[in-house]
Amino acid sequence: MFWNYATECRRERQWVGGVVWLVTVNLLAAQQCVGQVDPYHRNLLQLGYDHPLRGQGPRGAYGYYYYNNPEIIGTNIALRLAIAPAYLDGEFGFRQLFSPTTDFGVGFYGGAYGENYYEVRQGNYRRKESFDGHGGGLALSVYQLLNPGMLIPLNVVARGGMKYSGYEGNSSTSDDFELPDGRPTAFVRGGLRLAGKEPILYPDLGLEVSAWAERQWRLNDGTYGFDDDRGVNPKSDLYWAYAGLDYSWTNVGHKISFATTIGDSETVDRFSAWRLGGVLPLIAEFPLILPGYYYQELTARRFLHLYASYVFPLGAGNRFQFRLEGAGALVDYLEGFEQPDPWQSGVGCGLTFTPKGKNYRVVLRYGYGFGAIRNNGDEGGHSVGILFQYDFERHWRRTGN
């Protein structure tokens, strides 16, 4: 009922052979996620990698299989799964459980490396202060449609749950760095969402306007680090609003995208503050993209983020396309993560190939970050990457299987 191009992407992270694997399953603009009951069959393989050419920051990557069956049991029970090498995220959705306009979801997620933390200050990736994290949790969601029968759906979303996070050092963590204690975290989130976007790579059409608020309670706060020089706050509040549009002229192969996100917070720490940087579009439900920057390079209390892209064809058939994009953010940094300039921006380009059957898409891309601090305090960050999506549903329709 609700999906109508509403997306759900939870960001999770896994360290495999020195590469950060991001399991993009539900929203992690603020740790937990808001999924929605999806009425479409989906079988998607998503891969993405972003590699910095200057500096040694965290490398963003994701790899997962996305499965959705809207009628797994009868006609009113749906199952969504996102499966990565060491992490699983899913939700059972019960359509019209309480009323014809009310859906209910039971979410579950967990595995290894989903709570990793990467310390980046002033462009310096501090491996000795970074560590691995594991855990999982459960969540309950209610999705209430406010305008049944209207072309563009307006939904109220309420979600609450509990997760547990445990931490351990990796091969680079300093022996003198005291790790944070394992802890349970409770959370509640509420939001108002108009329309939404599909959970696919660069959708042709999409519209969303939404506003959200979240409260997190850490049931085991305290201090950690070098001589207990940093702490975990007992509670944090997050607020954000988003507006985005994707529109394509499919007959000529041109496409535009615009998005703006504004975020604020109260009593946040390193684990709950906003993180900006990187370019992978499926890294989060509301990706705070900055081309040329490391993944999660900037840590903020509040921000204003702007993004735009333009795509045009290269030759007949629209199989090859060239992509131009730019992003900027006005940032109020978390204490200890300040940089000389509150304005950060980057530009990027990419070459896209989509076959006639549109069962897969490949994107080769480059990004440059104007204010990214690199070696010796110089500014300017470069990155290259690749994105890949394979749609098994389209393949099966083409082959008749």
Describe the predicted segments one by one.
Residues 45-47, 77-81, 106-110, 154-160, ...:
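Membrane-embedded beta-strand positions of outer-membrane beta-barrel proteins
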Residues 33-42, 185-340, 372-401:
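C-terminal outer-membrane beta-barrel translocator/porin domains of Gram-negative envelope proteins
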Residues 17-29:
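Bacterial N-terminal signal peptides
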Residues 2, 31-110, 116-117, 183-205, ...:
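Outer-membrane beta-barrel initiation region
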Residues 49-55, 67-69, 81-87, 108-116, ...:
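Transmembrane beta-strands of outer-membrane beta-barrel pores
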Residues 50-54, 77-82, 125-131, 145-149, ...:
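Outer-membrane beta-barrel domain signature
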Residues 107-149, 169, 360-385:
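Outer-membrane beta-barrel translocator/channel fold
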Residues 59-63, 88-92, 134-140, 186-192, ...:
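Hydrophobic, lipid-facing positions within transmembrane beta-strands of outer-membrane proteins
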